[in-house]
Amino acid sequence: MNKTELINAVAEASELSKKDATKAVDSVFDTILDALKNGDKIQLIGFGNFEVRERSARKGRNPQTGEEIEIPASKVPAFKPGKALKDAVAGK
């Protein structure tokens, strides 16, 4: 499912217009993004957690030359599914 399909599903399930569903979906995504940029953790009980994780510096290799390079530390977004989401996907 892509973003357009998600918006259509939200519009249908909530009886919103596609315009209002688009605003709602975009607002949720923007709010999650802003929270992660600020270093906050988003906890949606039963669904899962969005957070920023630190990836430490490490050594890598240039695949074209084989030269060893240093990959700097970085921050990456992460999602950890909650128990209810895991159970629903597993059919429990």
Curated annotation (Swiss-Prot):
GO CC terms: cytosol; nucleoid
Consequence of changing F47W: No change in DNA-binding
Up-regulation conditions: Constitutively transcribed with 2 transcripts of 0.54 and 0.38 kb.
UniProt-annotated location(s): Cytoplasm, Nucleoid
Transmembrane intervals: none
Pfam families in UniProt: Bac_DNA_binding
Keyword annotations of the record: Cytoplasm, DNA condensation, DNA-binding, Phosphoprotein
Molecular function (Gene Ontology), one example: structural constituent of chromatin
Phenotypic effect of disruption: Essential, it cannot be deleted; upon depletion cell growth slows.
Gene3D superfamilies linked to this entry: IHF-like DNA-binding proteins
Tree of life domain: Bacteria
Residues modified as Phosphothreonine: T4
GO biological process entries: chromosome condensation
Record family assignment: Belongs to the bacterial histone-like protein family.
PANTHER family: DNA-BINDING PROTEIN HU, DNA-BINDING PROTEIN HU-BETA
Subunit structure: Homodimer.
Entry function: Histone-like DNA-binding protein which introduces negative supercoils in relaxed plasmid DNA in the presence of topoisomerase I. There are at least 20,000 monomers/cell. Capable of wrapping DNA to stabilize it, and thus to prevent its denaturation under extreme environmental conditions. Binds evenly across chromosome, does not display a preference for AT content. Binds ss- and dsDNA in a sequence non-specific manner; 8 nucleotides are sufficient to bind protein.
Name of the featured protein: DNA-binding protein HU 1
Gene label: hbs
